[in-house]
């Protein structure tokens, strides 16, 4: 079986960090999970959040107990929605709440900013680091850069855009788009 199957949260380390009760690893796993969804939100088209991804639902191994499914690893991320965990979505102190609230914020930004229109221009920007991706979007006078750190270490994106000041859509910070630190 050459497939790569798992929930987003499990691929990002949420499952492992929870099993090991490692708070620092959990914070990094949540950051990676949210970053991957942010990357998805910068793409054109309709972003699709798979059932359970909005709360960081981890792999469901119970498929192995069903002889009709045990041979197909895709069932690992097709488990039933964990409504008991979804009940934690409003609690910012839980994994589910941290992920749900941050994805909700990304969704709100995507809906409200015209730079995410389907017919916006989209391109990549050189970051001088193969583990850092920068995606630019432009629509009707608005420009946005999305920075994505695929490294396990904090990085600085050397994108050196010199055409003005930019506002971080998540924090509201206004700054130049040059030498941007990203976790």
Regions found by a protein language model. Give the residues of each.
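Active-site and adjacent substrate-binding regions of carbohydrate-active enzymes
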Residues: 1-183
């Amino acid at each position: 079986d050459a497939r790569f199957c798992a929930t987003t949260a499990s691929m990002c380390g949420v499952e492992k960090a929870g099993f090991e009760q490692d708070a620092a690893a959990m914070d990094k796993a949540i950051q990676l999970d949210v970053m991957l969804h942010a990357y998805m939100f910068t793409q054109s088209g309709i972003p699709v959040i798979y059932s359970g991804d909005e709360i960081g639902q981890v792999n469901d191994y119970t498929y192995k107990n069903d002889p009709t499914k045990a041979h197909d690893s895709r069932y690992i991320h097709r488990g039933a929605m964990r409504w008991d965990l979804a009940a934690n979505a409003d609690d910012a102190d839980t994994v589910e709440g941290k992920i749900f609230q941050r994805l909700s914020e990304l969704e709100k930004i995507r809906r409200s900013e015209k730079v995410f229109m389907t017919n916006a221009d989209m391109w990549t920007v050189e970051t001088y680091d193969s583990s850092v991706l920068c995606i630019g979007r432009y629509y009707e006078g608005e420009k946005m850069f999305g920075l994505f750190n695929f490294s396990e270490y904090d990085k600085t994106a050397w994108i050196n855009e010199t055409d003005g000041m930019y506002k971080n859509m998540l924090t509201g910070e206004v700054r130049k788009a040059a030498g941007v630190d990203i976790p």
